[in-house]
Amino acid sequence: SLHWQTVSVPHDWAISGPFDKKWDLQVVAIVQNGEKEKSEKSGRSGALPWIGEGYYTTSLNVGDMSGQRYTLEFDGAMAEPTVYVNGHKAGFWAYGYSPFRLDITPFLHPGSNTLAVSLRNQPESSRWYPGAGLYRPVKLVTMPVVSIDPWATFLRTEKADSASATLAFDTQV
């Protein structure tokens, strides 16, 4: 059953516990330690309840959308986040450690909109405590439809000496 509570993002649902060694219990023999028999080992993830599913929802008011593009930028969402806007699947990200973004413009309408994110941490998917939930900031970025894409902009040094440098700049509009 779901238990809804009001939280602020960033948020990690596992931090509040309850702590229990079952969350990271292994029965193994550590060969490097010379162990011949398997025994219980725990503690690699701090006994935090990071395995499971979590859901986040919020509302977003949008004014005149003409000429605008709306992007959600996630700095960290553990794990396997699926993003919904007004009940429509807007996107999925298969990894929890790297940032990602989604263009949600096609799913929005002027007025009140509902954003939802579901996350799922699988058993045995981490060797350490990975986090659980929207553990880093989430940003709504509004830009003109015609604009420089900050995630597709690259600057590199082609040549440099003590007197001058030549730089190359690549971007997408």
Description of each model-found segment:
Residues 2, 7, 61, 169-170:
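Beta-propeller folds
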Residues 78, 155-158:
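Short, solvent-exposed aromatic-acidic interface loops
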Residues 39-42, 86:
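Short Pro/Gly-enriched beta-strand edge/turn motifs at strand-loop
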Residues 46-150:
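Accessory beta-strand-rich segments of carbohydrate-active enzymes
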Residues 157-172:
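Contiguous beta-strand segments within globular domains
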Residues 1-37, 114-120, 134, 140:
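Accessory carbohydrate-binding/adhesion or oligomerization-edge regions at the termini
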